[in-house]
Design a protein with these regions (language model features):
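Bacterial N-terminal signal peptides that target proteins for export
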Residues: 1-9
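C-terminal motif of bacterial Sec signal peptides marking the signal peptidase cleavage site
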Residues: 17-20
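Bacterial signal peptide processing site
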Residues: 22-24
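Short, glycine-/small- and polar/acidic-enriched structural segments
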Residues: 26-154, 160-164, 180, 186, ...
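Short, solvent-exposed loop/beta-turn-alpha elements that line the ligand-binding surface or hinge
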Residues: 53-60, 206-217, 284-292
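Pocket-lining segment of extracytoplasmic ligand-binding domains
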Residues: 89-91, 169-262
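Secondary-structure end/capping motifs
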Residues: 231-306
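Conserved C-terminal helix/tail region of periplasmic/extracytoplasmic solute-binding proteins
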Residues: 297, 301-324
């Protein structure tokens, strides 16, 4: 009888232990992943992924945040609050140099800026003596424009540059002919063409950059960065996430109307009617980091020669590139 009681007690203890283990497993919380991206082409590129918010890997809960201003995005990254972010390519370098805790994992968009004019010009060489409007003095669109101008045999002093804070400010300027020539990105370019159908799209900065540098892709405009300490322990998730980003971009390019609907639902500021018309020239493309290391190195070298502060004080070393 005693033996039987002992056996029952042992069995009860074992069951209790197993139940305890099971409860602990059940109570294990999902890993929360914060993905931050700016309002504009990067959030358009990830719109399918953000709208569906699909389960990328069991045990992870992904939160997508669209930052409405560049300052908000910069603050989020520099405070290391984002596990994954899509940022301007120069901000990727700054984040690495300043925090040592972010790595470049891929590209979601190449150069989407265009030289447009109400005047009859054929290219960058024809800009001598003209006034050209652009966004952000000393920022990457300005530096890239000046690099292309110099490569076309002109001095930046040959051109009278005027600057505005955002691409949205360029649209009324050109549409009302307060400025006749400008460097305009998508999707603002599509909005401009609706207001001024006669505007001439003269050159793509990305295509011009490709010719000058002999690059296969052009210059990286939007970059996916991942937090290093998060990547170290969650590599499988990140690799799966990058595959989903690629699929999202393919879908967006192939289904502009649906992409416009998704963007509206996730809070992208651009109207869906503008989005679906802008995708043809938006240059959204996923390029894995292993395919674009040379492009980043070359672009950072160009930026550093104009203003080393634009990339955080120095060209990042090899550790900036994420390894799968």
């Amino acid at each position: 009888m005693k033996k039987r009681i002992i056996k029952i007690l042992i069995l009860a203890i074992c069951i209790a232990c197993l139940s305890g283990c099971s409860s602990k497993e059940d109570l294990k919380e999902d890993i929360s992943v914060k993905v931050s991206m700016p309002d504009g082409l990067p959030s358009i590129a990830l719109s399918k992924l953000a709208f569906e918010n699909k389960n990328i890997k069991d045990g992870y809960n992904v939160n997508y945040n669209i930052e409405k201003t560049p300052d908000n995005l910069s603050t989020t990254v520099m405070k290391e609050e984002a596990d994954i972010a899509v940022v301007p390519s120069n901000m990727a370098a700054i984040a690495y140099n300043k925090t040592k805790n972010y790595e470049i994992a891929g590209t979601t968009g190449l150069g989407s800026f265009y030289l447009v004019s109400n005047d009859d010009i054929g290219g960058f060489k024809d800009l001598k003596g003209k006034e050209v409007a652009n966004t952000g003095k000393g920022l990457t669109p300005d530096i890239t424009t000046k690099f292309i101008i110099k490569s076309n045999g002109l001095n930046e002093k040959d051109i009278n540059f005027t600057y505005v804070n955002s691409a949205n400010e360029l649209v009324p300027m050109i549409a009302s002919e307060k400025a006749n020539t400008a460097i305009v990105p998508e999707p603002a370019l599509t909005a401009l063409k609706i207001k001024n159908p006669e505007i001439k799209v003269v050159k793509s900065l990305n295509e011009e950059y490709k010719k000058i540098t002999k690059s296969d892709y052009g210059y990286p405009q939007a970059t996916i960065i991942v937090k290093s300490d998060f990547a170290k322990n969650n590599k499988e998730f990140i690799n799966l996430f990058l595959e989903e980003v690629k699929e999202s971009i393919i879908f967006v390019n192939s289904n502009p109307d649906k992409a416009g609907e998704y963007c509206e639902k996730i809070g992208v500021g651009t109207k869906k009617e503008i989005i679906n018309k802008s995708l043809e020239n938006a240059n959204l493309q996923f390029i894995g980091v292993e395919e674009s290391i040379k492009d980043y190195k070359d672009y950072y070298k160009i930026l550093s020669e104009y203003d080393i502060k634009s990339i955080g004080g120095k060209i990042p070393d090899e550790k900036v590139f994420y390894k799968k």
